């Protein structure tokens, strides 16, 4: 079977980590690839901060050592439980993998397929596989799952970092380290941008089937208050077109009616896949984006590929995985320190401005 680019990158990182420094030509020979391919790989990995590169020579970053001369991450086994290995969490996993490789640790992955009742067994499987600490993104879809299937996380016998999930204030889970995107900030960025373009209170079209969707909804209500806006019509419930065609059509019709009646000229849509399909269906009904409706997508997996490239809020998913892994390695290398304060890190999304809200150039806010 042909080696994937990710597997080749792992081998390249292992070679540099083992040797400390190496020339690009030497790496090409050891990897069995052309010098051009090796150079491209090195540039990519150096751009991600995983390697240092100077004049054809590659070195392992000196800053990877633990502060104070303590144990490094070399040889650590880290576990990662994710609800999915695709779409949103693919980038989170990639960031975690890169950070683990940089630390000299090995990352072991388990996927729950959004079955929260299996989270505990899969996490115990990670521990049985040798994980010394775990990154956990439970398969919760809402607060009821968190209440029913969450308490065990606080009882794990190893350092644990919660990924892209928030705990109920005051609960045992609230005492865990966690790293998550600040979706409230992302919603605020989107609404401020639409208001700056002269639109009245934008509508929200959003799902209800994930913690991200619920965080976007909560962030919308909070942003309205922050911006001093009157609450418009209720949030339009969106569903995937392939899962519920009738529900999807109801959402499109509700947005169509709001636009054609003059009640709304701007909307934020979660997520970008739904946004692309909604824009296509609106066009069939005679509503044009951005001429009749300024639209921003929440999430930026495929937003740039739409016929009219969509302005999008981009959660920092790769950085979430990276920072969470670095935090876990820090906990493991520092040893048991009961005085070490637990951290709740909220990483800020960016707004990538494209054509769907009336802009003509691509930029990030």
Give the residues covered by each predicted segment.
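Short, solvent-exposed amphipathic alpha-helices that sit
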Residues: 11, 88-102, 186-189, 211-231, ...
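Flexible loop/turn connectors
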Residues: 256-365
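Alpha-helical recognition/docking segments in bacterial nutrient-uptake
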Residues: 7, 11, 25, 43-46, ...
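N-terminal helix-turn-helix DNA-binding module of bacterial transcription factors
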Residues: 1-72
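An alpha-beta-alpha
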Residues: 188-229, 341-356
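Periplasmic-binding protein-like
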Residues: 79, 131-140, 201-207, 261-271, ...
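Hydrophobic alpha-helical segments within soluble ligand-binding/sensing domains
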Residues: 167-169, 174-204, 214, 248-255, ...
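Short beta-strand elements in bilobed, periplasmic/extracellular small-molecule ligand-binding domains
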Residues: 101-111, 204, 221-251
